[in-house]
């Protein structure tokens, strides 16, 4: 893992789920509602995944989530459920359901004032990310959003590298901030240091190396 060098950091690349926001208290009902809607409209018999199985998928690319949860369906069928999940999640986020972690708003504003380039590097879709940032009035602090398009951008690592290219910087100039293995992998792929959010959704022993460890998002302010 790349060592953290404070004076080299220009870009802060944030994951969303388990880093800035937790959808844990709305994910289960939303997924179940969407799967039940599909069952009713299609007449298919499906075993609804358990809460534990659903929560374990948080932070993975969307298509991978639904392949893991509903392998018996084809991609078009999974996408129809996934699209309904997105609509319902965005509605709930704008109703201020879900949880923005304590200190996020002040931390983001302070880092913006310190002239860091703030970016999002998430496996989530644009609508979901924008709903979170917009509903908490944080959207204006972040640069243009890059998301997985399953073409030129296929992973979180590709997202991070696209920001490095866009701002003409190298890996050591970006700090990847997140809670899951995909965030660790993105940092490693981009040659960047990794700030591990231990308060997020990581499984025990999922993250075994990091450049920094955060017990809360505002810990970043002390490191930077």
Language model features with spans:
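Conserved Lys-Pro-Asp/Glu-containing loop-to-beta segment of HAD-superfamily phosphomonoesterases
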Residues: 11, 156-184
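Conserved phosphate-coupling serine/threonine residues in phosphotransfer and NTP-handling enzymes
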Residues: 122-124
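Short, acidic loop-to-helix structural element flanking the phosphoryl-transfer center
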Residues: 91-120, 130, 157
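Glycine-rich phosphate-binding loop signature in dinucleotide/nucleotide-binding domains
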Residues: 5-7, 113-116, 167-172
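Acidic, Mg2+-coordinating phosphoryl-transfer loop and its flanking beta/alpha structural elements
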Residues: 175-213
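A short, structured active-site edge motif that brings together acidic residues
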Residues: 54, 139-154
């Amino acid at each position: 893992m790349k060592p953290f060098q404070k004076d080299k950091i220009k870009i802060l690349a944030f994951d969303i789920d388990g880093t800035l926001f937790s959808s844990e208290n709305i994910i289960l009902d939303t997924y179940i509602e969407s799967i039940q809607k599909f069952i009713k409209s299609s007449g298919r018999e499906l075993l609804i995944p358990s809460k534990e199985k659903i929560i374990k998928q948080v932070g993975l690319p969307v298509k991978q989530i639904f392949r893991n949860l509903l392998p018996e369906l084809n991609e078009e069928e999974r996408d129809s459920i996934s699209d309904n999940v997105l609509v319902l999640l965005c509605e709930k986020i704008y109703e201020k359901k879900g949880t923005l972690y304590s200190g996020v708003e002040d931390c983001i504003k302070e880092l913006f004032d310190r002239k860091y380039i703030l970016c999002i590097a998430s496996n989530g879709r644009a609508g979901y990310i924008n709903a979170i940032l917009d509903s908490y009035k944080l959207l204006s602090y972040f640069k243009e959003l890059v998301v997985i398009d399953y073409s030129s951008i296929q992973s979180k690592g590709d997202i991070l590298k696209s920001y490095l290219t866009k701002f003409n910087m190298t890996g050591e100039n970006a700090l990847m901030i997140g809670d899951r293995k995909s965030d660790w992998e993105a940092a490693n792929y981009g040659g960047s240091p990794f700030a591990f959010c231990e308060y997020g959704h990581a499984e025990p022993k999922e993250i075994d190396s990091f450049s920094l460890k955060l017990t809360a998002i505002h810990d970043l302010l002390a490191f930077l």
